[in-house]
Design a protein with these regions (language model features):
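N-terminal subdomain of lithium-sensitive/metallo-dependent phosphomonoesterases centered on the IMPase/IPPase/PAP
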Residues: 1-89, 160, 214
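Residue-level signal for inorganic ion chemistry
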Residues: 20, 24-27, 46, 57, ...
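Generic detector of well-ordered alpha-helical packing
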Residues: 47, 70, 88-91, 123, ...
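Short coil/turn connectors at secondary-structure junctions
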Residues: 62, 80-81, 113-115, 142-144, ...
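Short, Asp-centered acidic motifs that coordinate Mg2+ and/or phosphate
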Residues: 65, 117, 188-189
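Short loop/edge segments at beta-strand edges and connector loops
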Residues: 68-70, 132, 173, 219
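DPxDG-like acidic metal-binding loop motif
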Residues: 78-134
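An extended, acidic
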Residues: 141-252
Length: 252
């Protein structure tokens, strides 16, 4: 930074999510215009966004560890402290389809036992959701809550919640896009129990919690990040007034 001023963590998270997203948007348009197949576009996007994030974090936060879907294991994260949990391209399938907008970039900073900063960019929509400034939780008035699920097959937990609460459905691609639908007020509930990884939900969880939403495992327990095993079996984000009903639909 100019004059040796350290960039604030929130500002860095925002800048990285936006910057990676801009790279992805430009690369996708250029490659499709050149006639590239979807596999090539997906792989090139993953690599370009990962390279950008790692280069920037290495420069801006050389002492911090990184946990990334596309990166090598960073053993420094096992000692605790500051760990950036990133997904350079959440929703590769959607990214590799011209015109799809439901893909995201995730950047989160976890320190010891809590989030410090995070941002989720939806680059194709020119949107970014952050922990600072946090997104205000919108007021919604609906007769039936909206449950956001995967485009293809909804997991069992989603069926239980949909039946228990009489939900309408919204189908989207990536975990980031689904989570931000709840943050933005387009949906009310996102439930997933088909398994994912920490980088799939870290930034969405942080942004959702900063907005005042309810976030947990499907048993209602808090999610702990930077675990040695990056596998994360399940995830809930919903409006706080629906959390008891969601858990009741899951567990009775």
């Amino acid at each position: 930074m100019p004059g040796g001023v350290r960039e604030a963590d929130h500002d860095l998270a925002n800048r990285l999510a936006i910057g990676a997203g801009e790279i992805l948007v430009e690369l996708r348009a250029r490659m499709f215009s050149a006639g590239a197949d979807h596999w090539s576009v997906k792989d090139a996007g993953d690599a370009a966004a990962q390279r950008f994030l790692m280069d920037e974090l290495t420069t801006a936060r050389p002492d911090d560890a990184v946990l990334s879907e596309e990166g090598r294991e960073d053993p420094r994260r096992f000692g605790g402290g500051r760990v950036w949990i990133v997904d350079p391209l959440d929703g590769t399938r959607e990214y590799a389809q011209p015109g799809r907008v439901d893909w995201a970039v995730h950047v989160a900073l976890w320190e010891d036992d809590h989030f410090v900063a995070a941002a989720v960019a939806l680059p194709a929509l020119s949107k970014v959701f952050s922990t600072d400034p946090a997104s205000p939780m919108p007021e919604v008035k609906r007769r039936r809550p909206i449950l956001v699920t995967s485009r293809n097959t909804a997991p069992p937990a989603a069926h239980w919640v949909a039946n228990g609460l009489g939900c309408d459905a919204l189908r989207l691609g990536s975990a980031g896009a689904k989570s931000m639908a709840v943050v933005g007020g387009t949906a009310d509930i996102y439930v997933h129990d088909g398994g994912m990884f920490q980088w799939d939900t870290a930034a969405p969880a942080a942004v959702a919690m900063a907005a005042g939403l309810f976030v947990s495992r499907i048993d209602g327990s808090p999610i702990v990040y930077n675990e040695r095993d990056p596998w994360l079996p399940d995830f809930i984000v919903c409006r706080p007034e629906l959390s008891d009903d969601v858990l009741r639909a899951l567990w009775g």
